[in-house]
Every structure is written in structure tokens, then in C-alpha cells.
Amino acid sequence: MKIAVVGCGYWGRNLVRNFSELGTLKYVCDSDRSTAEAIGDQHNVSTTELDNIFETEVDGIVIATPAAQHFEIAKAALQSQKHVFVEKPLALNVEEAEALCALSKQQKKVLMVGHLLQYHSAFLKLKSIVSDGGLGKLQYIYSNRLNLGKFRNEENILWSFAPHDISMILGLAGDIPKTVT
């Protein structure tokens, strides 16, 4: 599989590194051309402008841009017959998220959101215990962040952390909650 990464900021660089190590990275793209070129040189891959990324021979596009850009880039990628991995959040509202899900189904392409904590070994163990009934029937889940990491002014803390917590809670519950307080 050939991959292009769009967005070479803080988290995008991590994704670039991982796909490069897997040998699947073919293109990088960033709104700052000099950043894209430096990262492209570092990983020995080509760079291209956003408008051209959809015409490349890649199989999938990884989106690590600011959240406000996710919908339009993901939509264009799906319309170009590319599989899409988009960092959270998928979109800024339910209507856009549902439109992307419908488009991915129509195009028969994978649309995946980067809820990486779903694959963390500690979460997988907890999920196994819950699934096996080791905690009985879940009645209540409380979530508290112990490590907020690096504070970034360019994004809202709600968009940074809440999607991870919500995805894990839904993964444990296996259903949509009846109430949230």
C-alpha cells in the first residue's frame, strides 16, 4: 500500500515517521512548502501540493491537519478513490461526519479515525476484562485525565482529548449511553 500524509505538524511528523519505517510512505504535503520539503528530504519521499495529492498513485491518504480542514480533505480523498485515515476529530459536526461515512461506503473505501488509544495494551486488557464479565455489568464510567501533555494554543483542548476518552468509553460500553452527566 502506498500512503501520502497531509499535514506535517507535531502529530503529522509522527505519522510520517511511522509510515516511512513501514516502507509505505510515498508523498508528504504541508501548507508550509519548506516544511514539506524538509520532511520529504529527511524520509526520501516526494512532496506535492494539496490539490495534486488526490491525483497521485497512492492507495491511501493520511490527514493530520487542523480539525477544521478534515472534512474537505477527507471528502476530496474519498472522491478520488483513496482510502482515508484522518486524525480525530473526523469532522466538526455530525452532518459532515455522516456525509463522510456515507461517501466511504458508496466509494467502497476505508475511512478510519485515529483513535489510537483503542489499540493501547492497557485499554485492550480492560476491554477484555469488561467483555468477559470480570467487572459485571457496567453501570457508570468516570474518566479523568492525569497527563494533559503539551499544551498547544492552536487547538481547543476539547478537540485534543475528549475524542479519545469518548471513543474508549464507547468501546467499553459497547453501546451508546442513555445519559451523560
What does each model-found stretch correspond to?
Residues 45-101:
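Beta-loop-alpha module in the N-terminal Rossmann-like domain of NAD(P)-dependent dehydrogenases
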Residues 1-43, 169-170:
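N-terminal Rossmann-like dinucleotide-binding module
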Residues 26, 59, 139:
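Conserved acidic residues
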Residues 148-181:
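Rossmann-like dinucleotide-binding domain that binds NAD(P)(H)
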Residues 91-153, 165:
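A contiguous active-site-proximal alpha/beta segment in oxidoreductase catalytic domains
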